Every structure is written in C-alpha cells, then in structure tokens.
Amino acid sequence: AFLVRDTSNIQWLTAFDDVFDEEAAHALYVCPDHAWLHTDSRYVTACENAARLKPLEVSAERETHAQFAAKRWGGRPAGAADALLGIEDGVSLAEYRRLQKAFAEADAEEPFVETDGVVVGLRAVKDRYEIARMRGAQSITDAAFEHIVRYMRPGMMERQVQLELEEFMLRHGAQGLAFPS
C-alpha cells in the first residue's frame, strides 16, 4: 500500500480538477485494487462528485489521516501480513510520529517504508491530456505577459502590477498561479 499526503500528488493521482486547494486536508491510501481518499467535510461533496466514475472511495470520517491509514491497514486482505506501507519522503516528522502512534494504538506493527519521488517520477511522463493543459497554460501566460507589458506605466506600484497580472490570468482561465508573482 502507499500513503500519499502531498496535495499536488493526490490531485495528479486522482485526476480531480478544481477540487483541491493548497491546504493539506487530504490523504490518499492506495492499494493494488482500491484507493481511499480521506478528506474533511469542506471537500467531501466535491471529492465525491469527482470520484463518481473512479475506483476511489471518499471518506470524511472524523479522525486523523494517521488513524484513517491505520484503520485501512488493519483491514488489508489475508496473506498480506508481510506487506509494507510506502510513505512519501515529504512526510513531516510530526506526521510520521502520528502514524507511529495511530498504528501502535491499532496494535499494528510499523509497516512503514520511505519512498523517494515515486509519484514525482510518474508525473514526469506526460500524456496528451496533460500536454494540452500545459499548452493552454502557456497560452494564458503569453497573453498575460503581452497584457502586462502594455498595462505598466512609470510610477506604478509593484503591487498594482502584481494584482493586474494575477487577475488577468484568472479571468482568462488559469486555475491558480504556478508560483507567487
């Protein structure tokens, strides 16, 4: 099994559009034949709608992501006693300790194995859909650059330019900014 906590990786693995923001309110628990997304009540409706045709179960159970993972681990199929649970290399020490505690409370041995860029490696290979989206994003960026060059005037505050640039990109279809402007 594999536990994913990075929101960008969860978004890529689930292929959910316009569901997640930057808050770390989600955990994805993936097994060979099933996956569960643990989220909080603010996101559950959007996640359930996005998951309708996917082999993914959405849960908003009131428990920590670590407790959720421990519960899923306890319910793994017979014969999986020697299995491991991969965790992302970006998991914080605090999150790791919560996992240890939740698994101890569930009387489960620690099955954790650190992974190194598993999802990042998968994300590096682009399909036609992703390439089309990248081209669309580049078109928005090009148009925004042309607009902002014409918009700027001597004496303007940087903040004015920043807000105009961001607003232009969002008005023209950007879902957000790739990095702060």
Where are these regions (language model features)?
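Active-site cores enriched in adjacent His and Asp/Glu residues with nearby glycine-rich loops
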Residues: 1-10, 139-181
